């Protein structure tokens, strides 16, 4: 989802380490290299600050089996997840099927609907279309706060907004994570 902020060194990791808990991260296979680099920095910082050896681990796997086994393991006491609704729901189900259910802190789906009314479109529609297009592309489209779904009332204002938005999206340069 967003490997530099949520995946490896995100709030879940920082919170657990701050509370004195060890952390095991199962990296997403699409950014395992980034995960390894960030993990190296975390391990270096842990050593530098006197944390115990093994307080942080990063596991790489292209499938879901490693994540499933981590959630099922009796020594794991909580799960943090950022990603799809399907993946998060599957982990939540596994966590609750354990003899001792554990909490799952999941950020999933991020469709982020935006409701726009004709009066707002009439006042600032063209400007807002430009800003909306930029927001969609923010962070290579990986920010969980990016807008995803526009809800509006059918009419001339929405048609004009849609046309301007399409033009603005076509102007965007592809970006890399």
How should these model regions be labeled?
Residues 136-139:
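Active-site C-terminal subdomain of aminotransferase-like
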